Regions:
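Gly/Ala-rich beta-loop-alpha elbow adjacent to hydrolase catalytic centers
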Residues: 178, 182
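C-terminal catalytic histidine-bearing segment of alpha/beta-hydrolase fold enzymes
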Residues: 276, 289-290, 309-359
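Structural cue for short, hydrophobic secondary-structure segments
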Residues: 76-81, 110, 275
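A domain-start/cap signature at the N-terminus of enzymes
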Residues: 26-75, 83-107, 132, 136-147, ...
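Active-site glycine-rich loops that stabilize anionic/oxyanionic intermediates
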Residues: 80-84, 213
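Conserved acidic catalytic loop of the alpha/beta-hydrolase fold
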Residues: 153-171
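The feature captures the conserved acid-bearing segment of alpha/beta-hydrolase catalytic domains
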Residues: 201-314
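Short glycine-enriched nucleophile-adjacent loop
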Residues: 183-196
Length: 359
């Protein structure tokens, strides 16, 4: 029989152990509940993402990609425009998340794709400037830094991290969105991205290409711009290399060259793509692409987007694409993303995206 003192020691030990277990459980629960970073000052919500050797990238985020998070059910990968202002892109999508009560459950990621003139630190990726506005990252070209990683491989690697069940076990939806130059990136990544079809069961990937300056067409036909209904299509008689990538599928870059053209053409209609167009985005000023290749797609961004949506209806009778026009908005990312139409595209309700018959 235990002596009273012994019984007291055991009782004390039991209570201490129980208290420790309770404290550990509470600490574990507290660790599981992570507070999103929602500051919009430069640098506050910024981290460095290491994708491989000599392949670092700065990105803004609400939650870190490196820590397990059971709260996250949605992810938004937002691509900046020609100005490479990742903070502005992050803030614009964050505002849309706040307006739709999607902050706590959404990881918002805004990577920055620098060019050489930005003089990024050693070990960071950077791309070429090309002609001043046609930066290589917009079309998924290889970086010209020590690691020649494709800009589309960056998105693949980010989606691969999101796909880790041990890190984001409750993820259900990923939206890739970009405006202007970021819209160009988004449309072309929707065409050829390699990681999206590898996402685990139950994770849906969507794309929102907002006011891109040009599109990658899937064949050699272009709209007869004299027909405002976009029902007339023709192969242009021109010396202009209008069907070379990034405007068509001829002479694609190394990333897309890994996939047979027939596969690109077959898979693109099956991907859930929204062409988000500003009703007033009809100016040719600023960084507008006025090349002959682009002008054969339309004379302004609204016309180019409307024509490309009609192209999908004409040549791909079954697809998961939709054209959405935002009334009263021109070329402004914040207004586009925070319109009712923009919010619905970035944070869609469950379901949708079924193959539909065009016409």
């Amino acid at each position: 029989m235990l002596k009273p003192a012994t019984r007291g020691c055991l009782a004390t030990a039991f209570l201490v152990a129980a208290a420790c277990a309770s404290t550990a459980q509470a600490a574990s629960q507290a660790a599981a509940m992570v507070t999103p970073c929602t500051a919009t000052q430069a640098g506050v919500c910024r981290e460095t993402l290491t994708l491989a050797r000599d392949a670092k990238l700065a990105y803004y985020r609400t939650y870190s990609l490196s820590a397990p998070n059971t709260q996250v059910t949605k992810a938004v990968l937002v691509i900046h425009g020609t100005d490479r202002n990742a903070l502005a892109a992050f803030t614009q999508v964050l505002n849309a998340a706040k307006a739709t009560s999607n902050v706590a459950n959404t990881i918002i990621l805004a990577p920055r794709f620098p060019i050489k003139e930005d003089t990024p630190p050693p070990g960071f990726l950077y791309w070429d400037r090309k002609d001043g506005i046609d930066h290589g990252w917009k079309q998924g070209d290889d970086a010209i830094s020590a690691n020649p990683m494709s800009a589309f491989t960056v998105a693949d690697r980010i989606l691969r991290l999101l796909n880790l069940a041990t890190r984001f076990p409750n993820l259900q939806q990923v939206t890739v969105v970009g405006h202007s130059g970021g819209g160009q990136y988004t449309q072309r990544y929707a065409l050829g991205g390699k990681q999206p079809p590898l996402m685990r069961a139950g994770v849906t990937v969507r794309y929102v290409a907002a006011n891109p300056g040009s599109y990658t067409y899937l064949n050699g036909f272009r709209p007869d711009l004299a027909d405002p209904t976009y029902q007339t299509w023709q192969v242009p008689v021109t010396s202009c290399p209008y069907n070379r990538y990034k405007y068509g599928l001829e002479a694609v870059n190394d990333y897309l060259d890994d996939t047979p053209p027939a596969t690109l053409v077959a898979q693109y209609p099956t991907r859930r793509v929204t062409y988000l167009l500003g009703e007033l985005d009809t100016s040719r000023a600023g960084t507008f692409d006025s090349s002959c290749q682009a002008d054969l797609q339309g004379l302004h961004r609204l016309e180019r987007g409307s024509a490309f949506a009609a192209f999908m209806d004409r040549y791909h009778l079954q697809h998961r694409h939709q054209r959405v026009v935002v009334p009263g908005v021109a070329h402004a990312a914040g207004l586009m993303f925070n319109s009712p139409q923009g919010r619905a595209a970035i944070f869609p309700a469950s379901g949708g995206g079924q193959l539909r018959l065009a016409g």
